[in-house]
Amino acid sequence: PLYSSAASDVYKRQDYDNTLTYTEEALRLCQPMPPVPDANQEAIRYFMSEGGIFSVATGRAKPAFERVAADVPMNGPTILFNGAAIYDFPAGKYLCEAFLPDEAKDCIQQVIGALPFSAVELYHDNNDIHALQPNDVTRRHLHITHSPTVFVDSMTEVPSPISKALFSTEPENQPALLDFLRAQPWYDRYE
């Protein structure tokens, strides 16, 4: 836990004004897990009551995270899409967004065309998700996130803007996917 009775005196002596703390939550959502422990919630609430700003940074899209957002005490904006967006849940609006450039669609199509074992999930800020060439990894991931997804046959069917592209393949094919990506002249333009 973040907070324990042994550490309580230390926490209570801190000045948290203008202190921003983010936590990364991916493991919490990957499997059914219990809610944030009471002791952790107490520590977070204390931190916020003393002027601290607390929130979450996640690779998840807004619809996947908003189902659990109410269970996490936060008073700061949430980082979504692996950093491509900052969202204010209480205000219900994006504060900042960075989209993939339109030419990314051609790059994605090249990967999918060259590697039939690879799939890609495409995330949009309006909560839409598209999947191109879905595989078992895609289906397992969508089962975990419970996000409605539109399956498409080509990148021409995917609207812009795109907030995040997530390639997936079985573990034995990951080296081939990574080697292919690294060999492309556009590889360094993307994270």
Task: Enumerate the language-model features and the residues they cover.
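Asp-based phosphoryl-transfer active-site loop
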Residues: 12-29
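Conserved acidic, metal-coordinating active-site core of Asp-based
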Residues: 117-119, 123-191
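Solvent-exposed alpha-helices and their adjacent loops that cap or buttress functional pockets
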Residues: 5, 72, 157-159
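Active-site phosphate-binding/coordination module
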Residues: 37-138
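Small/polar loops that bind or transfer phosphate-bearing groups
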Residues: 3, 56-57, 169
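Hydrophobic alpha-helical segments, especially N-terminal targeting/anchoring helices
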Residues: 3, 14, 21, 87-88
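Single conserved hydrophobic/aromatic residue that forms the stacking wall/gate
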Residues: 1-7, 11
